[in-house]
Design a protein with these regions (language model features):
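Contiguous beta-strand/loop segments that form the cofactor/metal-binding neighborhood of enzyme cores
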Residues: 1-69, 99-108
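Short, acidic/hydrophobic/Gly-rich beta-strand patch recurrent on exposed beta strands
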Residues: 53, 74-77
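Solvent-exposed strand-loop boundary residues in beta-sheet-rich modules
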Residues: 58, 77-79
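Surface-exposed loop/edge segments in extracytoplasmic proteins
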Residues: 80-84
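Active-site loop of classical SDR/Rossmann-like NAD(P)-dependent oxidoreductases
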Residues: 87-99, 115
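C-terminal helix-rich "cap/oligomerization" subdomain common to oxidoreductases
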Residues: 100-141
Length: 141
């Protein structure tokens, strides 16, 4: 989510808890950008509630639940009452994404496809670097 919103960071560090099988079960990543640092904590080994929060000088956004579901989010702006939004029209979390893809294909919007690919590449580059930094090796390495 962080790379999707803010782009590729200037640098990133990752501290991982590595399981018996050599794979990270949880960890914290810090991503440095011009003017701010973003952090992410993830835990495959925990059943704790998920949420994400973006905090800035003029306000904040908080979403409870897994970021890939986004059932609702609350926006708080300095000097205003927070407002909560629930924009999902469907029960399944992926219907909106499928509709967007269908629209992109119908319009032959290859620019949107390329933008999505660029984001995916940026995310994978950050994740690959973080994995190697944490000493996590795959057989294919």
């Amino acid at each position: 989510l962080i790379v999707s919103l803010f782009g590729r960071p200037k640098s990133a560090i990752y501290g991982a808890n590595v399981g018996f099988n050599g794979i990270d079960t949880s960890g914290i990543m810090a991503l440095r950008y011009d003017g701010f640092v973003a952090t992410a904590a993830a835990a495959k080994d925990s059943d704790s509630p998920s949420f994400f929060m973006i905090q800035g000088e003029s306000g904040w956004i908080r979403a409870d639940g897994a970021p890939n579901e986004l059932p609702s989010f609350t926006v708080g702006l300095r000097g205003s009452e927070p407002k909560t939004y629930a924009l999902n029209r469907y029960e399944h979390r992926m219907v909106h994404e499928f509709e967007a893809m269908q629209d992109i294909f119908a319009r032959k919007d290859y620019m949107s496809v390329e933008e999505g690919m660029q984001t995916s590449r940026a995310v994978m580059a950050v994740m690959e670097k973080a994995r190697l930094m944490a000493g996590i090796q795959f057989r294919a390495d």
